[in-house]
Amino acid sequence: MSQPVYSLKQLADFLNVEFQGNGATLLSGVEEIGEAKAAHVTFLDNEKYAKHLKSSEAGAIILSRTQFQKYRELNKNFLIVSESPSLVFQKCLELFIAPVDSGFPGIHPTAVIHPTAIIEEHVCIEPYVVICQHARIGAACHIGTGSVIGAHSSIGEHSYIYPRVVVRERVSIGKRVIIQPGAIIGSCGFGYVTSAFGQHKHLKHLGTVIIEDDVEIGANTTIDRGRFKHSIVREGSKIDNLVQIAHQVEVGQHSMVVAQAGIAGSTKIGNHVIIGGQAGVTGHICIADHVIMMAQTGVTKSITSPGIYGGAPARPYQEVHRQVAKIRNLPRLEERIASLEKLVQKLEALSEQH
């Protein structure tokens, strides 16, 4: 496979952006700004990497119009964009690094498909996939090797299911959904009743899971089905790897849940919420729209106001910051208290002498 090569001007025309510099510069790859060489395209999005601009050997640097006004005197080859530099860099990434498919077009003969399943046109079903009775696979879907689609479940058109994914029975997956390897959608929730003798009896979970359009679910993430209602991930939300979403949880539109976070049962997460890595959210509470939880936040009660929260139990970031500052000052305060105690002892001794 030959490596594509573009001049700076050709690339600017393709991206429909302005450029500064030598339009004949040849570009054949992408790289981080601190490591880019003469044939590489790179980008500046986070200002903390601006320190690399002056010394960068990159053949082209993508930056915003505001950044260009700030750094134009460096006389580098710049691609000047109106949107996020990272988004434009992504277009370059896909231009220079061609996607690789599995090499198994169509429906592989080792796939086991129940005769009542509905398979729409232009579907790719890789080796050893199992599709159960009355399942529906939408047009232009891709089902990866070893995945299982349960009975009466549906996968919306243009969705991509990577290898070894399990979508259990009666689960609804929307359009353009991406599910990474090892994810399990629709497993039984962790619901038990404890008897008078201390024995735990599992409660059958007969609800289901609804994944709306344009959702992405990371590797080895689990989303449990409801006991009698639905667990729902709303449109456009992104779930990272190794996330646990319990029974009858609702995640609102365009929210993000970062790796190793856990959301306990029957909790409702609002729209545009960000849950940081290793955060834990207790059950039967509500989280307002536009809430950001820092990494390892422990949420024990509902959050009713937008804002940034951290700590355990969760509280507004400003309060956490003040408390951390006070904790850092504890050694100095301890020294001051010790000095004051010595001074008090001296004063008491002098008082006794008189």
Curated annotation (Swiss-Prot):
The keyword Acyltransferase applies. The active site is at 247 (proton acceptor). GO terms for cellular component: membrane. It is an enzyme of class 2 (transferase). Signal peptide: none annotated. GO terms for molecular function: N-acyltransferase activity. It catalyses: a UDP-3-O-[(3R)-3-hydroxyacyl]-alpha-D-glucosamine + a (3R)-hydroxyacyl-[ACP] = a UDP-2-N,3-O-bis[(3R)-3-hydroxyacyl]-alpha-D-glucosamine + holo-[ACP] + H(+). GO terms for biological process: lipid A biosynthetic process. It comes from the Bacteria. Belongs to the transferase hexapeptide repeat family. LpxD subfamily. Homotrimer. This is UDP-3-O-acylglucosamine N-acyltransferase. The gene is lpxD.
